[in-house]
Amino acid sequence: MAEINKPAFKKPDLKKMTPKGERKANRRGAARLAAVQALYQMDIGGAGINETFAEFESFWIGNEVEGEQYLPAEAAFFRDIVAGVVREQKQIDPLIDDLLARGWPLARIDAILRAVMRAGAYELEHRKDIPARVVVSEYVDVAHAFVEKDETGMVNAVLDQIARRFREDEFTRS
């Protein structure tokens, strides 16, 4: 059984994510990565949201952990994603489930991919201040940090369909 504080998935390549020249986008990208890790940890370890916020904000985000430097993240954005997924999960999961291939219900998908798709679905439906293509691209990048290319294609396909459902106008403009 995996320890709660140690991810049981492929670690992201943090060397590709340099804190130099930090911009809002970098802090948001770091928040997305942290949110996916937090959602994963909550899913497999059963940790509560307040405990998870406290741990990530004091131990992971912006700190060096096991020799790896984690980028500072936009804390409010991190909290919004995690809290939003927890609050909306009963609506998000069936939405994702309907878009997955037959025989592959969400419960059968790897926990890290569930976390990526849940976070992406939440942002696409509830954070309309961020362009849909940016959201999809960012979560595909997050997925690349943990899984192989074939699995990131599934993330891209599911999130693209969700984006088109909730943000149709962004895809019909010329």
Swiss-Prot record:
GO terms for molecular function: RNA binding. Keywords: RNA-binding, Transcription, Transcription antitermination, Transcription regulation. One of its GO terms (cellular component) is cytosol. Gene3D superfamilies: NusB-like. Involved in transcription antitermination. Required for transcription of ribosomal RNA (rRNA) genes. Binds specifically to the boxA antiterminator sequence of the ribosomal RNA (rrn) operons. PANTHER family: ANTITERMINATION NUSB DOMAIN-CONTAINING PROTEIN, N UTILIZATION SUBSTANCE PROTEIN B-RELATED. This is Transcription antitermination protein NusB. It comes from Rhodopseudomonas palustris (strain ATCC BAA-98 / CGA009).
